[in-house]
Design a protein with these regions (language model features):
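Amphipathic alpha-helical scaffolding segments comprising HEAT/armadillo-like alpha-solenoid repeats
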Residues: 502-512, 533-546, 565-579, 600-610, ...
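Primarily the internal scaffold of c-type cytochrome electron-transfer domains
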Residues: 63-67, 71-83, 88-90, 105-174, ...
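Structural signature of tandem alpha-helical TPR/SEL1-like repeats
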Residues: 534-536, 567-570, 601-607, 632-644, ...
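Helix-start (N-cap) detector for alpha-helical repeat units in TPR-like alpha-solenoids
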Residues: 550-553, 584, 619-620, 653-654, ...
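Structural marker of alpha-solenoid helical repeat scaffolds
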Residues: 531, 547, 563, 581, ...
Length: 800
């Protein structure tokens, strides 16, 4: 039935994803975004999409997408492998023992270090205390036993099939402060026990505390979340090849050397060892050795000490980080606090990349002895090597660090905890119950950010008996206006963007223009993705896609995927050029963002497929492959991957939510509802899941249940504009005009840039004979979107 002018907008289904078009950087982080079909769903389901509407039906301002592709990339002809065969690679490695003769001092430091003991075989001396005498220990609701059987270590614990069994220990990872023990399984799998040993306390414990994980869960030690092959091996060994066979779901994992050997950081050195043997007396430099730059060394550290997406599974020292990884930065998630402090397990590289120290030219080896894997100097003396005003401490840098007197600067007594630089600027977070790690973001403690946005501050971490106001009063007294610094403004803006309280992208765009640090530029670009429909923001993405920093280019390229309108063609041209970028991270981002089906023989496409296959042993990897298949018209393939992801991690609400989107697009309303009900059961406080469940209920024809879930969504997230809008339409459909108007006004407050919300309200006012209110709402819609034809027609009917 044709809709009459002035009628309330019909609750339109979300159009299915066309021509692999999705928003923002979703693919790089999780998956290529999918669309969820629901009678009320006029917005793409993505967390807090704040893009303004450009048309009354189709959603955020975007160019008209090409028709959905039903063709598949042509099978690639036989081409050289992307990775060199491992036999050829491993033949270039000498092993750490080959370095000992000439580099004895460095070797001895390394052999005792956490790197030297990153992974090893069980040792009768080193592991004696853990297994003899027999120990029984309690964790959660479980009891486990560590003992020796025939002189070899075993652990009896809750394992496969829910039974307590004895598992022989075949390897050990970690050294200080904890050691984890490995169990070999069929299919080349190696699993990491969740019970670990603390050698200093001489105590067994569970790395997950009292979470009490059980068999069948992804994160239980028997699950994929504790699989050594995928989760541990690459950073505990030298030049590892995971060798996952997706067809058989098996591994053939190999490595050049067990543990983090010399060549993990220096690269393959067999040619050097042989050259030195042939030239024992010469003082000439070995022509086979490549001396790494400071940034190459930094990227080598980052290859393991970073939260990142792996693209190759084959990093080698000397290569750039961006040739092998896409770095996790501050974004809309809660992995980082808004000021850049770590919240989740993020390691050091990312935080340090965003620090003033990195911008000033400091690199890892300036502070850390790379062979001992410990600080070069302990205490404040390490920081004061630079912060005395003396130049020349940082090679190749003209930056002179500000002079710091620890007592005068900290307002704490000499040698007290509060006068230690690291306690304020590198606060500690403990992971795995026993592993304290310093934050490498070198942030400034700011109780105001604690009060406003719950960002932790070092003052209250120490002074646990004092409140935030006490700490805030002290910092304002001691430092006054110095606290009003750019990093505070940045943190406040990031927090506002995450909370959905920014009414435009201008504050973020201003910060982006003025930010000197590439890491933070990339972070701000990712946060700006919600405003990609704004022409100024889109032009910024086009500009920064050419930035010299690959981290910035990657973020900008990912953001270009959502650009439509007049700049859509320009965005696609830039993406096409970036598929030939000199860094793989950018190429992979670009080819995944292009609308056109890529050439299966192109380097960028093959690299993307390799990255997808590399992650295919994990549920999220299957989700990525499924999303790619669905985006390219292979619904059957997508379904197979999504079903596998759910089977591998049945307790993930997020995976079930994504699966529901696919099922909805296939018209399987009943199955969609089942998956969304399960997602909400697993994670009942996720507003987006409640919203999607409401859409699923409506697809099933139960509008009253849909209303209930929309209401739950806005209780959890009062700024969920899509939920308010759809709640308003649902109330209107039930004849509850007053409730509909109230909900739509809430939606306008939450998203003041979308013209459809006030237009929907205008139609309800008009139907009720409230002409003045109808004119006001229609006029508001036209203020937002002057070309909105339905609103123009309604105003004419109302006699403007």
């Amino acid at each position: 039935m044709a809709k009459k002018r002035g009628d309330a907008p019909a609750p339109d289904p979300i159009p299915q994803k066309a021509a692999r078009k999705s928003r923002g950087a979703a693919f790089a982080i999780v998956i290529v975004a999918l669309l969820f079909v629901g009678t009320f769903g006029w917005w793409k389901i993505a967390h807090r999409d704040r893009s303004p509407a450009a048309s009354p039906i189709q959603g955020a301002a975007q160019s008209s997408p090409a028709p959905a592709s039903t063709s598949q990339p042509k099978p690639a002809p036989l081409l050289p492998p992307l990775l060199e065969p491992e036999a050829q690679v491993f033949a270039r490695y000498a092993g750490s023992q080959g370095c000992r003769e000439c580099h004895a001092a460095q070797f001895e430091l390394w052999a005792k270090s956490n790197h030297g003991n990153a992974e090893r075989l069980p040792d009768k001396v080193m592991d004696a205390a853990a297994f003899s005498p027999e120990r029984t220990f309690h964790h959660g609701t479980q009891d486990s036993v560590a003992t020796l059987k025939d002189g070899k270590p075993v652990v009896k614990t809750l394992g496969f099939g829910g039974a307590h069994e004895r598992y022989p220990i075949t390897r050990v990872i970690g050294h200080d402060p904890l050691r984890q023990y490995l169990v070999e399984r069929p299919g080349g799998r190696v699993q990491t026990l969740e019970v670990a040993f603390d050698p200093k306390r001489n105590q067994w414990f569970d790395v997950y505390g009292d979470e009490d994980r059980k068999p069948g869960e992804w994160g239980h030690w028997t699950g994929r979340g504790m699989g050594w092959n995928a989760m541990c091996a690459s950073c505990h060994n030298t030049r590892l090849r995971k060798n996952y066979d997706g067809a058989k779901d098996t591994y053939r994992t190999t490595m050049a050397e067990m543990s983090v050997g010399c060549e993990s950081c220096h690269g393959p050195m067999k040619a050097h060892v042989e050259w030195r043997k042939q030239h024992p007396q010469t003082k000439e430099a070995d022509p086979t050795v490549q001396k790494l730059t400071r940034d190459q060394t930094f990227d080598t550290c980052g290859s393991c000490h970073a939260r990142r997406r792996e693209l190759t599974g084959d990093f080698v020292p000397g290569d750039s980080f961006a040739q092998h990884f896409q770095l996790t930065t501050v974004d809309e998630s809660d992995l980082y606090f808004p000021d850049g402090q770590i919240r989740d397990e993020l390691y050091e590289y990312g935080s340090f990349h965003g620090s003033k120290m990195h911008t000033a030219g400091v690199r890892c080896a300036d502070c850390h002895d790379p062979h001992a894997a410990k600080p070069r100097v302990m205490g404040n003396a390490l920081c004061l090597r630079c912060h005395t005003g003396a130049p020349g401490q940082i090679p190749d840098s003209t930056v002179i660090a500000p002079i710091i007197d620890p007592v005068a600067h900290s307002f704490h007594k000499a040698d007290s905890a509060g006068a230690q630089c690291v306690n304020c600027h590198m606060p500690v977070t403990t992971y795995m119950q026993r592993h304290p790690r310093h934050d490498h973001g070198f942030t400034i403690p700011d109780p105001l950010l604690t009060k406003e946005h719950r960002v932790p501050n070092a003052c209250n971490k120490c002074h646990t008996d004092k409140d935030t106001d006490w700490a805030l009063s002290a910092t304002e007294k001691w430092w006054g206006d110095k606290m009003k610094r750019p990093s505070r403004e940045r943190a406040q803006t990031v927090a506002a963007a995450r909370a959905g309280t920014l009414t435009s992208g201008v504050p973020l765009l201003t910060l982006l223009r003025n930010e000197p640090n590439g890491y933070w530029k990339a972070s701000l670009i990712r946060l700006l993705g919600a405003w990609s429909a704004d022409a100024e923001v889109a032009r910024a993405f086009l500009e920064y896609a050419q930035h010299p920093d690959p981290l910035v280019r990657t973020a900008a390229v990912q953001a270009l995927e959502s650009i439509g309108g007049p700049l859509g063609d320009a965005a696609q041209k830039v993406l096409a050029r970036r598929t030939e970028d000199n860094e793989r991270a950018v190429r992979v981002a670009a080819v995944s963002a292009l609308r056109a089906v890529p050439d299966a023989t192109s380097r960028a496409f093959r690299e993307l497929m390799h990255a997808l296959d590399l992650a295919a042993d994990q549920p999220m990897g299957q989700l990525q492959k499924g999303a790619w298949a669905q985006a390219n018209g292979d619904t059957a393939g997508a379904l197979a991957h999504f079903e596998k992801a759910v089977a591998w991690d049945p307790n993930s609400g997020g995976i079930r939510n994504e699966f529901a989107r696919l099922l909805s697009g296939m018209g399987r309303a009943e199955d969609t509802l089942v998956q969304m009900q399960e997602a909400v059961r697993l994670e009942p406080t996720q507003a987006e899941f409640r919203f999607n469940l409401a859409l699923a209920w409506n697809e099933a024809g139960n509008i009253r249940n849909a209303v209930r879930e929309f209401e739950e969504a806005v209780k959890i997230d009062p700024r969920h504009a899509r939920a308010w809008y759809n709640l308003g339409l649902a109330h209107s459909a039930l004849g509850k005009a007053a409730e509909a108007v109230t909900a739509l006004r809430k939606g306008e407050d939450a998203e003041p840039r979308d013209a459809r919300i006030p237009y929907a309200r205008a139609t309800i006012h008009a139907r009720l004979g409230q002409r003045a209110d109808a004119r006001e709402a229609a006029q508001r819609a036209l203020t937002i979107q002057p070309e909105y034809q339905d609103a123009q027609q309604l105003l004419r009917q109302l006699g403007q």
